């Protein structure tokens, strides 16, 4: 069927900010969809709130709206633009929920807008647990025994009948939010209450736990002619019970017999047909390992995280084709863009094994509960490709960027058998490493299978790796053993440690013996047809499929998995850099391992290498490609950390030199540079011992800011107020020694300013200056940023511009630099300089129209700023106000303190823009998920040091009509200031207390500033966590609270009696 000609304009709904459960995969799918629809001649309008994406670039769609994804704003855009149709299935759960809300509100009917791809009835049938269960019964498809519940009493009824354990699955939620496995009544109360709160329709499915079954996923496509295919089937190494986003996944499935494969394939196709989905769909199934009994777990009637993985695993671009199907094209009409010969109705075939390992944020949140269940906790993931599962797994392990090069963790070697058993039974993020350790210590595969029901096939593969370790250690210098180890995916790093040599010595030894990997192509058809796509992976085999051209090439290092501190912003910069390299006439080569991102879409670069970002894996590519050089500025700390090793191998680092990179990162060298340039910075020193740290802090005076050198995202950074806190930090947060010094600075309570600039060594161009709403001390990634600055005097702005230009030239920066300043007592101080792309590059690029990563790349390639039409100086400021607001995923991470400080905690960001600061802030806050009601109650409980400041805030809340609630101490201070307040009991009271008010939804805001000593038992911690669990905005910074007050005050009409007004006027006349 040809494409539809009765529609012209299509509104694509994006997925909003990155949160746990919904990450960069929707930037990839949304970008693909917009381009795909434009190719077919449709006018595309995009709405998304996330400025850090390629999707929200003006070139992606005909019109781009960066606005909150709420009914209020999306309805306004629909009424203004009058699209013929909307496509919501590429915006994740956000897009689906938005489509349902728009339909129910009547806006779609009012404006004559059609839903494309997946009809509303199919969305509701797949997402509403009751309707889905009914459909499965009609199809005779087995589902676990289950019950739909809307309250706790109904949950008790089901459990009394079926017994524990039960799984709670809330309806219309993302990444299993609010759900979990209940083993007893206490867990049932907690998880059901949470699930009902998080479900927008207050509905949960309770089902008998089938934990222990194999979990299998089928990624399927269907068109309007009822052609349906399986793009990819995947198997979770972790059995049912761990969310698929937190599971280690392999593709294709490894342990299914042909009968099992065909049985589950037929079921998946039957389901997509019954739902009438036109596009992509993900079906999750459970299979009993001892019989042919299977169960349908759930269906995602949209493009998902698994679709992105399946697309990268097979080379089959699901989102691109789903968009074409949505406008009426059929699979047998669409040419496969990989082979450019076959059609999209051919099912992909794989002659390799793909492994996906999640990347969790537990290195950031040490207090978080690491147990894995049905609620997702990973922020991102890595993917690797190999010719066997062992190779594929080990490549994925070293892609995680946790300083791990092999399936072993030193701290697990001390575990006894009983501890290992407990941790293997109750899965956590280290389970596969513990399984390997158990096998090393002689635990049998049978015992491990009994503990966790992981398939014997996977346990055998882990045992193969452990047996090979013994071979390697027993045969030092043996080339045959080395060859076998390399074929199994062992890294030079591991072999070097086993043979007591350096990694470079192993690398040289292999080269002398011609022991290097070959590169194979990902072609969707197992080499049956010729492929036109240069998408490669390395393996130790005979035939090399790589074609090295004569063109001059440049390598860009990607930023690896999404994690807190290094998000999609770096992928944005990477993609723009690749495009600039192509524009400059070079062959653009990218190395990355993140299946979710736009940068690993094979159509972006001239060559894509899906490889770990380690020195060994990168050098294999460089040895073959022999590029002009490597750009490390856009891949975050991942790429910067490789710069020194690459230079040791004789590789040219393009842009800012290694020496100058080091000068910006090394404390003493940086201090010397600032002194030479006459630029002030907070008083600070470097400590290499605990004693030294104590002495420095005494000399500088508390409070001090302490952090390790060379960090990203404020990792292990803290403000300490007294000596005992400093000693706790030095013993627990960092391992201090001569090679890893700790930096100690005077903490200045001032206004923080952030600047991004581009330097060519001679000229320094400043696209924008941003002001942070929160004072210095809250990580820049967690602050609300405002452009243009609203409270900076011209004199201070000039100082900042002068310092930025001096730093760009003085540090010999070639490319991008990011500087953070603090304004303290009308003086500008430099806090830090990052000689690379920062997380504000996409935001400022979109606002100012300066494509910063593109311009910087061309500078790096030798085209100076003047040639590109830019000179030294500050770009004229825009008239509108733009706000960048952080988005957090605390609801997914139990036991994590929500207090903001110098260590970054946000997972994503949104943008609000309007004519005034208040309106822009309103949009930013609403887009970030903060509800802003114009009246209600606010609980105020603050530390003693903040009481004076909190009084003014409380007074303003009272004046706009809010009720004030406070515990005795704070209430007394308010009463003394004649501010009406209701006293509430502290949380240790057995009577109705502060936590009850939060649980019952009777407070709209909680203002709670940190009481020191962050152990979870603290009252402050419990209040903050209770707020998160109950969806109440908890404000831990008084600066953020003031920003919200500005918005509330701008929304509130004043109400004064005539007498008050007359008295005020009389007072003014008397005093005139």
Swiss-Prot record:
Mg(2+) 4 binds at residues 832, 834. Mg(2+) 3 binds at residues 820, 832. Residues 133-327, 671-861 form the ATP-grasp domain. ATP 2 binds at residues 707, 746, 752, 777-780, 820, 832. GO terms for biological process: 'de novo' UMP biosynthetic process; glutamine metabolic process; L-arginine biosynthetic process. Mg(2+) 1 binds at residues 284, 298. Its cofactor is Mg(2+); Mn(2+). The keyword Transport does not apply. ATP 1 binds at residues 129, 169, 175-176, 208, 210, 215, 241-243, 284, 298. Mn(2+) 3 binds at residues 820, 832. Belongs to the CarB family. The large subunit is composed of 2 ATP-grasp domains that are involved in binding the 2 ATP molecules needed for carbamoyl phosphate synthesis. The N-terminal ATP-grasp domain (referred to as the carboxyphosphate synthetic component) catalyzes the ATP-dependent phosphorylation of hydrogencarbonate to carboxyphosphate and the subsequent nucleophilic attack by ammonia to form a carbamate intermediate. NCBIfam families: CPSaseII_lrg, PRK05294.1, PRK12815.1. This is Carbamoyl phosphate synthase large chain. The lineage of its organism: Bacteria, Bacillati, Bacillota, Bacilli, Bacillales. The gene is carB.
